[in-house]
Amino acid sequence: MLRIADKTFNSHLFTGTGKFASSQLMVEAIRASGSQLVTLAMKRVDLRQHNDAILMPLIEAGVTLLPNTSGAKTAEEAIFAAQLAREALGTHWLKLEIHPDARWLLPDPIETLKAAEALVKQGFVVLPYCGADPVLCKRLEEVGCAAVMPLGAPIGSNQGLETKAMLEIIIQQSTVPVVVDAGIGVPSHATQALEMGADAVLVNTAIAVADDPVMMATAFRLAVEAGVLARQAVPGNRSPYASATSPLTGFLEALA
């Protein structure tokens, strides 16, 4: 079980809604993933349409919606988008995203911290997408963010946990849930993140662009479950030396 703010989730896999070939395929993949928290960009939703092709299938699927501020380049833009999302969707949950550079999509740490502090004061449950910076993640925690979402690698890059060393520090020092977001390309990346101690992962591109998104979503569900179980089982310590699993002496004498 994973608890963030006022909600509890059975699944440790969060999913996104971008890049799917159709809304039907998106919903099928989300269902196969077992995900209970789904993020969607407000810029992709037509709030004037009551039967929006992205929003309505998600509502019917019964998942918790996590609107995000993707596209915002400043704290002010993100705060405005958050207020629109709360009014339109009736949720105070928000994935805060501020990335001014369209090529790299790296989060702006200064604007993110500024917006997070303001939004928490306005009553939002803020989950900020941020760089894998232990100092920044601690500051975001201190201003009241309900979780932190450090990147594993640039958005959509499928590179995996390129920031592993920093993620380990963030996980070790955090007192709020840590959700590894961005860069996860294959199910084994997700397993590794959960084994490290991350509370959840958010996966979008790796599922959406697969030849079979539903099958890939299933693979990610199983990978996340494996990672959680492995962590709970408490793996043995790593050692630079060999450790025999069978006796090395005495067996010949026993056979004599």
Curated annotation (Swiss-Prot):
Protein location: Cytoplasm
Key words, A-Z: Cytoplasm, Schiff base, Thiamine biosynthesis, Transferase
Gene Ontology BP annotations: thiamine diphosphate biosynthetic process
Cross-referenced InterPro entries: Aldolase_TIM, Thiazole_synthase_ThiG, ThiG
List of residues binding 1-deoxy-D-xylulose 5-phosphate: G156, A182, G183, N204, T205
Active site: K95
GO MF terms, alphabetically ordered: thiazole synthase activity
Reactions it catalyzes: [ThiS sulfur-carrier protein]-C-terminal-Gly-aminoethanethioate + 2-iminoacetate + 1-deoxy-D-xylulose 5-phosphate = [ThiS sulfur-carrier protein]-C-terminal Gly-Gly + 2-[(2R,5Z)-2-carboxy-4-methylthiazol-5(2H)-ylidene]ethyl phosphate + 2 H2O + H(+)
Function of the molecule: Catalyzes the rearrangement of 1-deoxy-D-xylulose 5-phosphate (DXP) to produce the thiazole phosphate moiety of thiamine. Sulfur is provided by the thiocarboxylate moiety of the carrier protein ThiS. In vitro, sulfur can be provided by H(2)S.
Quaternary data: Homotetramer. Forms heterodimers with either ThiH or ThiS.
The protein's name: Thiazole synthase
Native organism: Salmonella schwarzengrund (strain CVM19633)
